[in-house]
UniProtKB/Swiss-Prot annotation:
Gene name for this UniProt entry: RPL30
Keywords tagged on the record: Ribonucleoprotein, Ribosomal protein
GO cellular component: ribonucleoprotein complex; ribosome
Keyword hit for Metal-binding: no
Origin: domain of life: Eukaryota
Family annotation (Pfam families): Ribosomal_L7Ae
Homology family: Belongs to the eukaryotic ribosomal protein eL30 family.
Protein name per the record: Large ribosomal subunit protein eL30
Gene3D superfamilies, per database record: 3.30.1330.30
Covalent S-S links between cysteines: none
NCBIfam families membership: PRK01018.1
GO MF term list: RNA binding
Length: 105
């Protein structure tokens, strides 16, 4: 029961980031923000292809950015950020009022 509760908690924190913080969606913008050093946290969906996931992990390691692996697929991640389309990667640039950076550390 704890994983479902934890997932709901993360979804709420993501919704708060969308309302009050800065974020970007997608692989290309994530790599760009990682290379510029602007990303604070990246959230990767569970069904992201392995090669793409490893590239994101590599860039995150270079920029010393935290990586969180979302337990749902890209459909669920898109719904969590309030979009009606699939989202493979979410980059948190500024958490706003959310404590997602400390909660997922």
């Amino acid at each position: 029961m704890a994983p479902a509760k934890n997932q709901e908690n993360i979804n709420q924190k993501l919704a708060l980031v969308v309302k009050s913080g800065k974020y970007s969606l997608g692989y290309k913008s994530t790599v760009k923000s990682l290379r510029q050093g602007k990303a604070k946290l990246i959230i990767i969906a569970a069904n992201t292809p392995v090669l793409r996931k490893s590239e994101l992990e590599y860039y995150a390691m270079l920029s010393k950015t935290k990586v969180y692996y979302f337990q749902g697929g890209n459909n669920e991640l898109g719904t969590a950020v309030g979009k009606l389309f699939r989202v493979g990667v979410v980059t948190i640039l500024d958490a706003g009022d959310s404590d997602i950076l400390t909660a997922l550390a």
